[in-house]
């Protein structure tokens, strides 16, 4: 898993540096934060696909048994993405970086100017709660119904991430 993450991020960085025109090339830190986000999104997509794929073919059963590890790895990558975003885009001002992230763009009434960062933060909070409660101990403490409801919120988080990526891409093309 670790090797796969390293290869994915390395390939993303290499492709980003080699294939983009020099006039519009992103900085290496921007490529790194995008690579961490893209790798996290790919892992989450894989995690969501593993259940149905394991029913179709026994080849996917090893991934099903290791899904918890995939989820924790994906949340760590998403946290790294968020930390790099805060450091690069909001870490060099007098304002607290978290306040800057959430308050710098209040245009919630416009699709073109919507602060897509808030969608990513909301998804990250849900996914962090899921990762923190993924151990069987929390299933006992929370009860099966509450634990299941919390972990079914992954689909809402996935929708938030898709909206975060789409709005970020659209707004980044300006």
Description of each model-found segment:
Residues 1-174:
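Membrane-embedded alpha-helical bundles that constitute the cytochrome b-like, heme-associated redox core
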């Amino acid at each position: 898993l670790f090797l796969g993450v390293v290869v994915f991020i390395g390939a993303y960085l290499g492709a980003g540096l080699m294939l983009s025109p020099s006039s519009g090339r992103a900085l290496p830190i921007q490529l790194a934060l995008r690579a961490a986000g893209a790798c996290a999104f790919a892992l989450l997509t894989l995690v969501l696909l593993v259940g149905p794929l394991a029913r179709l073919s026994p080849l996917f059963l090893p991934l099903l048994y290791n899904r918890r590890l995939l989820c924790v790895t994906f949340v760590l990558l998403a946290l790294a993405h968020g930390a790099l975003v805060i450091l690069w885009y909001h870490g060099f001002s007098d304002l607290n970086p978290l306040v800057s992230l959430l308050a710098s763009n209040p245009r919630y009434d416009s699709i073109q100017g919507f602060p897509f960062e808030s969608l990513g933060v909301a998804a990250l909070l849900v996914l962090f709660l899921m990762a923190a409660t993924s151990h069987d101990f929390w299933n006992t403490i929370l009860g099966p119904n509450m634990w299941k409801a919390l972990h079914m919120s992954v689909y809402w988080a996935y929708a938030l991430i898709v909206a975060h990526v789409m709005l970020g891409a659209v707004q980044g093309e300006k």
